[in-house]
Amino acid sequence: MSNKSAWQPQFDEIHSSVQEAEGFLQSSNDVQKAIDEVHYPDSLNDLSEISKNLYISSWKTASELVSTSDKGIDYTLSAMSINPNLSVPEQQHLWLQIEDSSSQNILQYFEKSNKFIAFALSKNAKVLVHCFAGISRSVTLVAAYLMKENNWNTEEALSHINERRSGISPNANFLRQLRVYFECNYQLDRSLRPYRQWLFRRYGDFAVLNTRVPSEVAYAETVRARAGQLELRCKKCRFVLASSDYLVSHEPKDENNYSHTRCTHYFLEPIRWMQPELELGNLEGRFDCPKCNSKIGSYKWQGLQCSCLQWVCPALSILQSRVDAVRKLG
């Protein structure tokens, strides 16, 4: 299997023009003009067989193939923000409304797309996965399928695809989500820390982009630490605030400057006792101990700089000076 260095993202400038082209199509049926808006090599219009009976192409190629029944494509998966309007029987077509953007949650579609691809291949049918240019959304969905099917990591899947379709370029947001998918062993469950913390960081992205608090926040129940874990307890009343399962890790920005690398905060995921304060809808505020009401920390949905100089977003912070970190014995 090819190593990580076998592929590198290309054509990053295409992503913004793809969004513009799909936006244009929402108000016009001028398909050719929309295609002309995106300048990419003609080679990306090729039909690429990634593994037996599994193909990737651009939208232009997909439209031509399904209209002529060329190559014998039986099932088509469309990953576009607009309806691709393909002449495909409904039961043989899956349209996932996905944008090629830095905020799009594509993880939520992996299970559905994996099942669609697996079903088609189980019937010895040919399945085509396409987006607008055939370099980002379609590649990400096929990579997720290959990762789960072959127990591959992200780089192995993308190297495999790149060997068969040169010039792939999943956007940075999609790459992060593929890596979370691998870290979660191809499962999406809020009990899994990598997935939970990825969702949490999306809250901060939302707050920065929209200048308001996210409307739906998932709260963890306060649970006692397991053997060997840390338990954070209010220094004044000993109330258990969190276990190390819900710590949000970050690395000091400048490890060579010791005076600034000592973190004075514990950053946490949302925990049930925070809910009354966070549901006030403020972008920032303070945390009081739910038992003794003494101040223990603060929060800033749009992020704050830790004393170690690292930026943390969102920031739900407990001051280390206000709690005791106790390691639970077995």
From Swiss-Prot:
Keyword 4Fe-4S found: no
Nucleus found in the keyword field: yes
GO MF, any single term: protein tyrosine/serine/threonine phosphatase activity
Limits of the Tyrosine-protein phosphatase domain: 45-187
GO biological process, one term: signaling
EC number assigned by the record: 3.1.3.48
Pfam families membership: DSPc
Subcellular location: Cytoplasm; Nucleus
Main location: cytoplasm
Enzyme active site: 131 (phosphocysteine intermediate)
Signal peptide coordinates: none
Keywords: Cytoplasm, Hydrolase, Nucleus, Protein phosphatase, Stress response
Stored PROSITE patterns: TYR_PHOSPHATASE_2, TYR_PHOSPHATASE_DUAL
SUPFAM superfamilies: (Phosphotyrosine protein) phosphatases II
Catalyzed reactions per annotation: O-phospho-L-tyrosyl-[protein] + H2O = L-tyrosyl-[protein] + phosphate
Enzyme class: hydrolase
Known role: May be directly involved in signal transduction and/or cell cycle regulation. It is necessary for maintaining growth rate or spore germination. Could show both activity toward tyrosine-protein phosphate as well as with serine-protein phosphate.
Similarity field: Belongs to the protein-tyrosine phosphatase family. Non-receptor class dual specificity subfamily.
Protein name: Tyrosine-protein phosphatase yvh1
Lineage: Eukaryota, Fungi, Dikarya, Ascomycota, Taphrinomycotina
